């Protein structure tokens, strides 16, 4: 199955609606390939999940599976390490954490059932700036408290637990000062991962000291039914600003309120704002990535859509990809000066870029790529 000419024209024509950014359009050398850390399964819900590396050949117009390791259950977050290995976590409530080596072999696996804590993983990991520890988002399954696990980088053994100062911490990143930025999703969940008592939602964005876990700052939104989930940094050179984008999911009881809900929050300096009140018609952003040099791309898999936000047009979301199951996102530099994004869809990998032609590469076999992927390198 191939995408239509109309859909490609939408991807290319989206630039007309974006603010001018001074891009050069011709005569630039384009990368020939890209490697992505990804997770996937076969076409059926019961198929085995794998994590590994997908290689995109732009000139050959194909994707190959460079390495793959079978996983015990569905994964969620993927974190590349400097030596080429890959940290993979089980989907919430995650019972395992795994390291996969460059050759695709499983080097380590931690089963949380064997730890003394009652915590389970919430899906994301980040490596400390010093490289000695990793931080994991977790939930105490007895109390429901949000936790940050501090684990030895080499052994993956838990060294300490910090409070996340909220419910259901999901993704976390490190800021320029080495502190942790954590999206507390705020949704009460049972041990079987069922949502309940949504009137008690307590979503927040917090900053913790990266050495001690001390709470430095906590931000909340006026609407308590907006769950803060995924994070990305993006630098806007023209405005000399770095933004933290937060992809959100609406949990309102009223379907019309969910459909009308915004899907993006932005930490601008020290203020958490909702710049674009328009959303996606579903109130569900699945992933976020830096794009267009200072902006963010957001995916909405429920409606088959990826949209672009930029600080030069802060009230607007521009559609850049409209394909079924538009989901995993990662920033892609591409030709100078960068600003592109790679999007997983039901049909294959979609490439969007301000100065490169859009492209769609079909999957190498029948497969369903999971929620997130990460660009490793391009050549």
Segments predicted by a language model, with ranges:
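N-terminal export signals
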Residues: 1-2, 7-28
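Surface loop/turn motifs at the tips and blade-to-blade linkers of beta-strand repeat domains
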Residues: 68-72, 112-117, 162-165, 219-224, ...
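Blade-loop segments of beta-propeller domains
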Residues: 68-81, 85-127
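Beta-propeller blade signature
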Residues: 51-54, 148-152, 200-210, 260-268
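Asp-box/WD-like beta-propeller blade repeats and closely related beta-sheet repeat scaffolds
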Residues: 112-124, 136-175
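Short, conserved, GDST-rich strand-edge loop motifs in beta-rich repeat architectures
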Residues: 40-43, 137-140, 182-201, 246-259
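Residue-level detector of Asp-centered blade-edge/turn motifs that repeat once per structural unit
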Residues: 81-83, 129-130, 175-177, 235-240, ...
């Amino acid at each position: 199955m191939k995408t239509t000419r109309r859909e490609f024209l939408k991807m290319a024509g989206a630039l007309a609606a974006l603010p001018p950014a001074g891009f050069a359009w011709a005569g630039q050398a384009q990368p020939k390939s890209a490697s992505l850390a990804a997770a996937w399964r076969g076409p059926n819900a019961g198929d085995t999940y794998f994590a590994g590396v997908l290689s995109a050949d732009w000139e050959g117009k194909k994707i190959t599976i460079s390495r793959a390791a079978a996983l015990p259950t569905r994964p969620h977050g993927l974190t590349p390490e400097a030596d080429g290995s890959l940290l993979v976590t089980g989907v919430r409530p995650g019972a395992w954490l795994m390291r996969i080596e460059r050759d695709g072999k499983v080097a380590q696996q931690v089963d949380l059932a064997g730890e003394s804590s009652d915590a389970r993983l919430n899906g994301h990991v980040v490596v400390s700036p010093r490289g000695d520890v990793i931080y994991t988002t977790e939930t105490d399954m007895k109390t429901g408290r949000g936790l940050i696990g501090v684990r030895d980088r080499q052994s993956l053994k838990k060294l300490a637990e910090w409070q996340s100062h909220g419910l259901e911490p999901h993704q976390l990143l490190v800021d320029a000062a080495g502190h942790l930025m954590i999206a507390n999703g705020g949704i009460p969940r049972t041990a079987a991962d069922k949502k309940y008592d949504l009137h008690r939602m307590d979503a927040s964005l917090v900053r913790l000291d990266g050495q001690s876990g001390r709470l430095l700052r906590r931000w909340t939104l006026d609407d308590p039914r907006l769950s803060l989930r995924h994070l990305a940094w993006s630098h806007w050179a023209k405005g000399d600003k770095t933004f933290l984008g937060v992809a959100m999911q609406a949990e309102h009881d009223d379907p019309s309120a969910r459909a009308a809900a915004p899907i993006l929050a932005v930490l601008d300096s020290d203020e958490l704002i909702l710049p674009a009140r328009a959303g996606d018609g579903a109130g569900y952003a699945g992933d976020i990535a830096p794009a267009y040099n200072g902006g963010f791309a957001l995916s909405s898999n429920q409606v088959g859509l990826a949209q672009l936000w930029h600080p030069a047009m802060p009230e607007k979301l521009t559609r850049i990809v409209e394909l079924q199951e538009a989901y995993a996102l990662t920033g892609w530099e591409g030709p100078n000066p960068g600003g592109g994004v790679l999007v997983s869809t039901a049909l294959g990998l979609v490439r969007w870029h301000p100065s490169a032609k859009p492209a769609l590469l079909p999957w190498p076999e029948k497969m369903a790529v999971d929620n997130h992927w990460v660009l490793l390198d391009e050549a």
